Structure formats: C-alpha cells, structure tokens
Amino acid sequence: MEQQLKDIISACDLAIQNEDFDTLMNYYSEDAVLVVKPGMIARGKEEIKKAFITIANYFNHHIVPTQGKMILLEAGDTVLVLSQTLLDSDKKDSEYAMERRATYVFKKNAQGEWLCVIDNSYGTDLIGV
C-alpha cells in the first residue's frame, strides 16, 4: 500500500507539472476536497480541476511539486498521508510557502483504487491563518 500511494502521489505531481488536469482528476474521488489556499476550498472534480488551472496561471505555468519525507497512516480503507511537499516555480514572489507540511487523505474505492478525498497542501498551517 505504501509504495502504491507514493507512486500515485508522484503521478499526481507529474500531472500538475505537465498541466495534465484530466489525468490528475483520475486520482480524485467525485466528492473530493482541495484546499486551494487558506480560506478557499474546491469541492468535487469540476471545481478542483478549475482550481488547478488557476494555480497553474498563478505560477506562470511553471510549477514542479515534489514530495520529501512521507508518513502514511492506514486504517482499513483510509490512509492519512503526512508529507513534506516542495514546490519549485519561476515565480519567486509567491505569497504562499514553497515548502509545506501537507496532509492528504486517500480512500480505497469498491474497485480497489486509492483516490484522494482530501488534498490539503497547507497541512496544519491552516490553523494559524
């Protein structure tokens, strides 16, 4: 399970880098939630896809997300991923941190696929906002 989820997250990072948002949406549940930025949440695949397009525009179409150290906590069909997320971009004046302690929640569906249900790249930093 651990390597499978790390591979999924790497595939998501690559899809974001390549702005292949249709492929990216294959890794999200229909009712997924994405923390776009503090105070702004996208709900469902349609909103999430639009949010990623907006994020790509914000970073001048050059964002390279990678994951550092990860801890995965599994309980049945649910996994909490705690990850050091690193963002590289040509945009040097971002008002948002480029190194984050992200939290992701994945759930296994009836077909045995792991899908992201909560994508929060800000992690617990949301508490301080």
Swiss-Prot record:
InterPro entries: NTF2-like_dom_sf (IPR032710), SnoaL-like (IPR037401). SUPFAM superfamilies: NTF2-like. Pfam families: SnoaL_3. This is Uncharacterized protein YybH. The lineage of its organism: Bacteria, Bacillati, Bacillota, Bacilli, Bacillales. The gene is yybH.
